[in-house]
Design a protein with these regions (language model features):
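Short, acidic/small-residue loops that bind anionic groups at enzyme active sites
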Residues: 113, 118, 132-156
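Electrostatically charged, flexible surface regions
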Residues: 10, 145-275
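Short Gly/Thr/Asp-enriched flexible loops that form oxyanion-binding sites at enzyme active sites
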Residues: 72, 124-139
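Positively charged, low-complexity intrinsically disordered leader regions
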Residues: 1-17
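Histidine-anchored nucleotide/phosphate-binding helix
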Residues: 33-48
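Residues at the starts of beta-strands that form the adenosine-phosphate
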Residues: 49-58, 83
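Short, glycine-rich nucleotide/cofactor-binding loops
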Residues: 1, 21-36
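A glycine-rich helix N-cap at a beta->alpha junction
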Residues: 68-100
Length: 275
């Protein structure tokens, strides 16, 4: 879960500047993880047949066991995931290394074929947890996947990934870690060898699919397993510690009216001194 980016104005820093407080924040599913959930659901369904699941999606959330986290997990279950795992932890006790260690413990227990996760968290933007997890597992990592296609042998995946300079196409077999870009939401981005290649998914602009009313009702009965960092035998010691947080300087809020373009240019040059 992450603090809702749309409510960033509510962010507060503790008096000593050593922490960001969660008071008054609203929580939601990490948007990047929502993209990954959509990819995982497409990989494990026959979209040409209503409600035809051909695999299992297990959600993992790390955070406090409160109503917000429970709601977010239920949201993912309502979209189609089969079950959830909640690893209880305080938000302030996590960094990318701890998250990767927790996920490795879950992977060791669950033995999934793939781990599909957001490339970053919307609040921290570290963009390293997936890579650290893959290193701990000894699995290949494909970051910023924009399309996934199952090979003719049913074992190989052909993946296109976004680069700053273009697109790279790679093939991978066996267990792997994927992080996804928003292009995974395109109508033909995932071909799993079961859903007909001619099938076109609904066009998604921002996030994954919406939950149906039936899915919402079914999600209430789907299992969520609770565990803790200690139960998983994970060292919860952070390797990254922030020394200070500062809010940006407050704006004056003053409004100045200008008569014409010449007046605007004069004020930008002589008063604001930005040109």
């Amino acid at each position: 879960r992450v603090a809702d980016p749309d409510n960033a104005s509510k962010l507060k820093v503790s008096g000593d500047g050593t922490a960001v407080t969660s008071e008054g924040l609203e929580w939601k599913m990490n948007p990047f993880d929502d993209w990954s959930l959509e990819a995982a659901l497409r990989l494990t369904e026959n979209a040409a047949e209503k409600n035809a699941r051909v695999g299992e999606v297990v959600l993992v959330s790390i955070g406090p066991n409160d109503e917000h986290t429970q709601r977010i997990i239920r949201e993912g279950l309502a979209k189609g995931a089969e079950r959830g795992i909640l690893v209880e932890s305080e938000d302030g006790s996590l960094d990318s290394g701890v998250v990767a260690a927790i996920l490795k413990a879950i992977v060791d227990k669950e033995s999934p074929d793939l781990v599909v996760m957001g490339k970053q968290a919307a609040d921290g933007d570290s963009n390293v947890a997936g890579t650290v997890l893959a290193e701990k597992l000894g699995w290949p990592i494909i970051n910023s996947a924009m399309s996934i296609k199952t090979g003719d042998d049913g074992k190989t995946l052909e993946v296109k990934r976004e680069l700053d300079t273009g697109v790279a196409t790679v093939k991978v077999s066996g267990p792997a870690v994927f992080t996804t870009s928003d292009r995974i939401l395109q109508t033909d981005s995932v071909k799993n060898g079961v859903t007909p290649d001619s099938h076109q998914y609904a066009k998604l602009e921002v996030g994954g699919r919406y939950a149906s009313l039936k899915g919402i009702m079914q999600a209430k009965k789907k299992p969520i397993d609770n565990t803790s960092v200690a139960d998983l035998g994970v060292d919860a010691g952070k390797t990254l510690n922030y020394t200070k947080f500062e809010l940006p300087p407050a704006r004056s809020g003053e409004t100045t009216f200008v008569e014409d373009v010449a007046d605007l240019v004069d004020k930008l040059h002589n008063t604001a001194k930005v040109i």
